[in-house]
């Protein structure tokens, strides 16, 4: 077993004109590669390019290839893929202006605004009343030319984080927001506990993960009066920092 970073991928002359090396070794020498690459950052174009180069190596099994990884990172692509598979997702639209945010509020009431490419809940905001929260939307639009705008669902009952690995769901958590907060975010006071996911929730999680083509995923699923809603299928599951707290069996 070998470990290498995306920065250690390189083009070199080869028998067919060009070959790819991974940490100095020919890519063809590997049977499979497990991808846990980070695509965020100022150098994201370079990182996507390198991961795509790796995905194009003939005969190499990559878990998971660049197209799957990018779709899992993009909120817009993810919503499109899940909806096309008939899975329950929040009503979603793009917003490039305050007018479009206001129109969404008129249609859905409270809405969530966030960048399509984001992580750890950064710059995810709720606009519950457009007139009162207009400055929040204005600030986000000043930094992101296009925002994901989705209907907001109450989170008082918590949010499920289901981990899917192949056909198994080894770690299932219920995240509960802190008192007075709508955010199911552990870094902002939310708590979490393990629970036994019911069969219908497990099946939905497996279907969503298959639709995305992801091998190892962490799903955020919200229970609503109308049934489950799939918020996100993350290619990097995370474990809510629980490995640094109480030891559990993985």
Predicted regions and their residues:
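ATP-grasp fold ATP-binding core
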Residues: 82-83, 105-123, 145-155
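C-terminal active-site "lid" helix and adjoining low-complexity regulatory extension at the edge
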Residues: 196, 223-250
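Rossmann-like NAD(P)H-binding beta-loop-alpha module
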Residues: 85-109
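Conserved N-proximal alpha/beta basic substrate-recognition cap immediately N-terminal to
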Residues: 1-91
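Protein kinase-like catalytic core scaffold
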Residues: 111, 148, 170-171, 217, ...
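Short glycine-rich anion-binding loops that position phosphate/pyrophosphate groups of nucleotides
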Residues: 38-40, 117-118, 236
């Amino acid at each position: 077993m070998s470990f290498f970073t995306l920065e250690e991928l390189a083009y070199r002359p080869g028998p067919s004109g060009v070959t790819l090396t991974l940490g100095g070794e020919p890519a063809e020498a590997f049977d499979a590669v497990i991808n846990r690459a980070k695509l965020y950052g100022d150098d994201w174009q370079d990182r996507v390019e390198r991961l795509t180069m790796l995905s194009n190596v003939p005969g190499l099994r990559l878990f998971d290839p660049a197209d799957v990884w990018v779709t899992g990172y993009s909120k817009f692509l993810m919503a499109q893929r899940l909806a096309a598979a008939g899975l329950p997702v929040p009503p979603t639209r793009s917003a490039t202006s305050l007018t479009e945010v206001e129109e969404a509020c008129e249609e859905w009431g409270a809405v969530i605004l966030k960048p399509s490419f984001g992580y750890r809940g950064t710059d995810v905001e709720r606009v519950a009343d457009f007139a009162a929260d207009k400055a929040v939307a204005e600030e986000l639009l000043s930094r992101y030319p296009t925002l994901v705008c989705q209907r907001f669902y109450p989170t008082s009952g918590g949010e499920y984080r289901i981990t899917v690995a192949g056909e198994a769901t080894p770690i299932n958590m219920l995240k509960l927001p802190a008192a007075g907060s709508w955010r199911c975010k552990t870094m902002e006071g939310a708590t979490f506990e393990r629970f036994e996911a019911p069969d219908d929730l497990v099946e939905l999680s497996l279907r969503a993960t298959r639709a995305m083509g992801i091998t190892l995923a962490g799903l955020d699923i919200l229970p609503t009066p109308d049934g489950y809603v799939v918020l996100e299928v993350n290619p990097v599951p995370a474990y809510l920092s629980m490995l640094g707290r109480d030891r559990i069996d993985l």
